[in-house]
Amino acid sequence: MGNVEDVKVGIAASIDGADRAVAGIQAAADQLDQSLALLRVTAVGSFHPAAVAAINQLEQARLRLDEAIQLSRTAVESANMFRSMI
């Protein structure tokens, strides 16, 4: 472990990386929203099990991306708190 300033610089770099990851996850979530909307419109009136499964799976993927975003943001808050305390 380096001096306090080195630690703070490392934490800041980690936070920057996490922020970039959140932006990427958000972009992926937006794309999934578009894909899901298109699939719903395309499959309207169809009760085919494969269409229903595809919609359900995309919804689950979207929820997990939301969870990843929330966890990442919470981690950034914790890292910022740590950085401010040292």
What spans do the regions from the language model cover?
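Amphipathic alpha-helical hairpins/coiled-coils and adjacent low-complexity
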Residues: M1-I86
